[in-house]
Amino acid sequence: MSKILVFGHQNPDSDAIGSSVAFAYLAKEAWGLDTEAVALGTPNEETAYVLDYFGVQAPRVVESAKAEGVETVILTDHNEFQQSISDIKDVTVYGVVDHHRVANFETANPLYMRLEPVGSASSIVYRMFKENGVSVPKELAGLLLSGLISDTLLLKSPTTHASDIPVAKELAELAGVNLEEYGLEMLKAGTNLSSKTAAELIDIDAKTFELNGEAVRVAQVNTVDINDILARQEEIEVAIQEAIVTEGYSDFVLMITDIVNSNSEILALGSNMAKVEAAFEFTLENNHAFLAGAVSRKKQVVPQLTESYNA
């Protein structure tokens, strides 16, 4: 079989990068596939910290599979086509390893799919290493651990599955790190946003969801102080409005998450703000509102928006 590109979603986070790099290695070792891990964007601050810590080179960034002369791909940490490579509909999806909802996904041929409602795609990839009797190199254990820490906010997010806890402990041992100490330093590295422009800030960790025919962009930034982000509200709103016009979003929802106190502020703009307010049972004042206890886009934001938009 010819080369297969393995990649996570656009605007890759630590789980997208870690799961794709590790799975590409596993696919070679376990099944003899000619795989290459690539990325659909440059690493964010948190992921750059992870790669540097474990001495792993960032995957090269690609925009099109066809431009690489590749006809076959494997997706990790996503399945929705609008979150994937630009020519996803023109290539063969060989397999998917994911922990999100399945939506806007269709293939012409059968494929391998591994979907589990766990805290991270990295958790699933680690299990697949064990199932296939493949040892996890120290640096890949570090990447997989980081993906799990990132997606579950160090196992504090409601997306954390009971099985994620022993996985985190095992990966920390394999990676040679203290779970709590490394996890906190890693998460803090991702909150250093002062050098980011407003346009960059709203695109660090952003995904587009098709909700009842509407293109809704849901972005998330982590911080240790929500007010640091809200102090830039004016320029952030300008960037959001530009993104709405340029990309054709109906609505843009920015989730500003306090990783210390496990709360979020929702900043939202667009044409369906009544639906956004109904989703969270709050009232937007000056385009934002507090959402107590919310840290997970996947579990505490997207399902609520989906229900509201479909009502």
From Swiss-Prot:
**Subcellular location per the Swiss-Prot or TrEMBL entry:** Cytoplasm
Q: Which GO terms describe its molecular function?
A: inorganic diphosphate phosphatase activity; manganese ion binding
The primary site where this protein sits is cytoplasm
Q: Keywords on this record?
A: Cytoplasm, Hydrolase, Manganese, Metal-binding, Phosphoprotein
Annotated residues for binding of Mn(2+) 2: D15, D77, H99, D151
Which EC number(s) are documented for this chain? 3.6.1.1
Which cofactor is recorded for it?
Answer: Mn(2+)
Cellular component aspect of the GO annotation: cytoplasm
Q: How is it modified after translation?
A: Phosphorylated on serine residue(s) by stk1. Dephosphorylated by stp1.
Task: Give a yes or no for keyword S-adenosyl-L-methionine in this entry.
Answer: no
Q: Which reaction equations make up its catalytic activity? A: diphosphate + H2O = 2 phosphate + H(+)
UniProt keyword Metal-binding, yes or no: yes
Binding-site list for Mn(2+) 1: H9, D13, D77
Extract the Pfam families matched here.
DHH (PF01368), DHHA2 (PF02833)
List the cysteine pairs that form cystine: none
Q: What InterPro entries is this protein classified in? A: DDH_dom, DHH_sf, DHHA2, DHHA2_dom_sf, Mn-dep_inorganic_PyrPase, Oligoribo/pAp-PDE_c-di-AMP_PDE
Cofactor: bound how, per the entry note? Answer: Binds 2 manganese ions per subunit.
Q: Which SUPFAM superfamilies match?
A: DHH phosphoesterases
Q: Which family does it belong to?
A: Belongs to the PPase class C family.
Protein's UniProt name: Probable manganese-dependent inorganic pyrophosphatase
